[in-house]
Amino acid sequence: MQLHISPSMRSITISSSNEFIDLMKIKVAARHISYRTLFHTILILAFLLPFVFILTAVVTLEGVNKCSSFDCFGRRLGPRLLGRIDDSEQRLVRDFYKILNEVSTQEIPDGLKLPESFSQLVSDMKNNHYDAKTFALVFRAMVEKFERDLRESKFAELMNKHFAASSIPKGIHCLSLRLTDEYSSNAHARRQLPSPELLPVLSDNAYHHFVLATDNILAASVVVSSAVQSSSKPEKIVFHVITDKKTYAGMHSWFALNSVAPAIVEVKSVHQFDWLTRENVPVLEAVESHNSIRNYYHGNHIAGANLSETTPRTFASKLQSRSPKYISLLNHLRIYLPELFPNLDKVVFLDDDIVIQKDLSPLWDIDLNGKVNGAVETCRGEDVWVMSKRLRNYFNFSHPLIAKHLDPEECAWAYGMNIFDLRTWRKTNIRETYHSWLKENLKSNLTMWKLGTLPPALIAFKGHVQPIDSSWHMLGLGYQSKTNLENAKKAAVIHYNGQSKPWLEIGFEHLRPFWTKYVNYSNDFIKNCHILE
């Protein structure tokens, strides 16, 4: 191949030795040509010539005498590229589609032996001389079997994930045991929290009071540490950590041995609240002891379920709603905040699977417009999976009571980070409404709703919720692996709601650093228990 530019600059000639491109001339009037035009021409040719060279070489190697240059070009690059399909190919495609349509409605014979792999299918075709229809039928049966196996594997994966999410990791169990032992042997671990001179602060409304109910010591440490480190006024922070009787010693030890000064921490067990008696919480006592309820949360999660008509996502939601934590008193405590803290006017209630990234003190300045609950709504937002929750997502609207009292299109709101006006709350019947609907659902054998503790709260707080800006509380980090990282960085609170908690191995690796940032890996108890190693 040669490129020749005439001395007069009137023509550019391209020629090839094999006559694939015999001659190409670009003629230009001398008086109109400019160096810029020439430069652009040569630049275009620099991109074009390698392609022409390769194409010429291919044609030469394949044999240029067997076809014309353009015909070879079309044949080598494929008829579809040039939009040409010969009649025989069209007939073959039509016949194959016809066979597929016939086979799609045909019954697959019982006992049909299916190949284990595609290579075995090809081998069987050769050995048994399959016609096209037999091949299509066997191939369809193979695909359907593969789909069934894949579906069963997906449900098995979801079940295993459910059990993993409900279990206690070895490291966290170790941490609780070691801290409990420390409480019994170390007087400093038993020191009063807070110190006696700071006790009046626990009921002082000039401070910012946070309530955290959890039996997870590691999670509690992250919530408290992230709040203190993100605050512009840590000296104004008071944390009321509520736990159960078995975790109390370990929880107390942690905060006694790991000060978050100047913030103040109080640790109490549910058995230390005089108000929490069986007389005041009879419904929850019934929920915890009712056999059908216990079987629902602890029994066989697949028995009675029609998996053929259930999508994996729906099944995952049902499994999440059957977490044993939903029959724990700790998970219902927020409904009793006005009684548990009779001297406080406002509190922020936090779940233990959140991380605080910004100063939350402005929450106390938000005007709730006479409402009780400041919360982020979950029916609108960029993430349509996480932020598309309406009442229809939580309730069974085929139940007459639900259909009568609720609107399926009403926007839902989120637990996890809520600002509660306790003074206004005490003037309402929210607690009584909550108990009443719990009783109704218990009577109906859990046919009104099945997803945890939020549904009765959605009813009880109806008309008492003030929406707050969504930037205060970002949800979904425990089940949405495609969480927008930039939005997560900007959110005041990020919430790992869902099964993939950051302290579990099933947590999302790329979302875990937001949480581990506040884990004190230099702590001896953390190191000795090999947390998240």
Curated annotation (Swiss-Prot):
InterPro entries: GAUT, Glyco_trans_8, Nucleotide-diphossugar_trans. This is Probable galacturonosyltransferase 13. Belongs to the glycosyltransferase 8 family. Residues 62-533 are lumenal. Glycans are attached at N306, N396, N445, N520. It comes from Arabidopsis thaliana (Mouse-ear cress). GO terms for molecular function: polygalacturonate 4-alpha-galacturonosyltransferase activity. Its EC number is 2.4.1.-. Keywords: Cell wall biogenesis/degradation, Glycoprotein, Glycosyltransferase, Golgi apparatus, Membrane, Signal-anchor, Transferase, Transmembrane, Transmembrane helix.
